[in-house]
Amino acid sequence: AEYAFIAFPIKNAEAVNKGEKPVTELGVKAVDDLTLEVELEQAVPYFLNLVAFPSYYPLNEKFVTEKGDKFGLESDTTVYNGPFVLTDWKHEQGWKLKKNDQYWDKKTVKLDEINYSVVKEVATRVNLYDTNAIDFALLSGEFVDKYRNNKEEFGTYSQVSTYFLRMNQKRGGQDTPLKSQKLREAIALSIDKKNLSNVILNDGSKPADFLVPKGLATGPDGKDFQETFKNGIKPDAKKAAAAWEEAKKELGKDQVTIELLNYDTGNAKKVGEYVKDQIEKNLKGVTVNIKLQPFKQKLKLETEQDYDLSYAGWGPDYADPMTFLDMFQSNHSHNQMSFADPKYDDMIKKAGGELMGDAKKRWEELGKAEKLLLEQDVALVPLYQRGDAYVQKPNAKGIVHHNISPEYSFKWAYMTEKDGK
């Protein structure tokens, strides 16, 4: 399974996953009907964060076995134990959440039903909001100014997720132009991220030279990871042009065409066009062709490494820098760009192993690893830390926003009458 790695802190989990040990040797046992005992490979300071991640959720074995390959693919082949159950799931169109009468704390849940609509075009979304067809809508930058002064309905929040350009070094068994470290560096230097965040996105997003987002985690000294390390390459058009001159020598050519894989949604299209413009303007001789794909197909092409550049993002699975840094190890299932640096692998291995008992040294090692990844290897190009701008009807109350895992909790949500009663 692609996400098996998240269970590897458990004793023998990696060996069981590889088929090297039987599942009976996994470090988990049921002490009684309500208690699990978990043995770890070593102390993991963020383990309780991990067990709140969906990959750790318990499953009803009888139900899963009965549904087989169809488990989780439809609303009626999924089992629920939260405040709501999923119904009327029409793929790519929408779904409903209905109050779960079996939920242990159902008396707290005030809403009977929540209706989701999948609306890719923001203009359509805004029209639905303005005509009172929906109560909540995420906005893209061009609609922010329309609502910004409406204090009752408009808001923004910062996510602890980072968006970046993957730079694939091998495609179809052949090296891509991005195998050139100097070309990767030139691209990293060529993109004005402030303009991207403040003008193109205009939704509360912030420019990022870093991978590990601000607000994710603090070190032993109580300081934010980015406040301590301040890693990353700052954009500079002159330095970009100079790095491109060096890249030409590495590549043995003056012109390069690269493909940018992108989502087919409105905001992503704008970012893709901006990135293309910045690279082509600042690196004369580099041509960027954009390939738009639906979400699922884009992920498939990334997994198959059938791309050159890819506009991608990552949100945390748990509150530790490792959730961003470990996926660029050479053997990680989410590397997906043939990046490999034994020194980086060793740093991540140490931070996830022998240094677990020394918080200060572990923190320093993670900071050095991010610096190596972004400034020396230039494995990827951070673009921005995501912000979300939204409008919400004043009578929609009690929606809780989370930075990690599910974005919203509706357990405490309720609707008042539109006159405020």
Specify the residue positions occupied by each region the protein language model found:
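Long beta-strand-rich cores associated with HINT superfamily self-processing modules
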Residues: Y390-K421
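Structural transition elements
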Residues: P207-E246, N267-K269, G357
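Ligand-site clamp/hinge motif
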Residues: Q102-K146
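Extracytoplasmic/peripheral linker and loop segments enriched in polar/acidic and small residues
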Residues: G19-T24, V28, G285-K298, L325-K393, ...
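Ligand/substrate-recognition segments at binding pockets and active sites
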Residues: H91, E245-P316, D388
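Gly/Pro-rich hinge or "lid" segments in bacterial periplasmic/extracellular proteins
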Residues: K11-E25, V31-L34, L40-V109, E113
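Ligand-binding "clamshell"
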Residues: D145-S158, D306, D320-N335, K393-K397
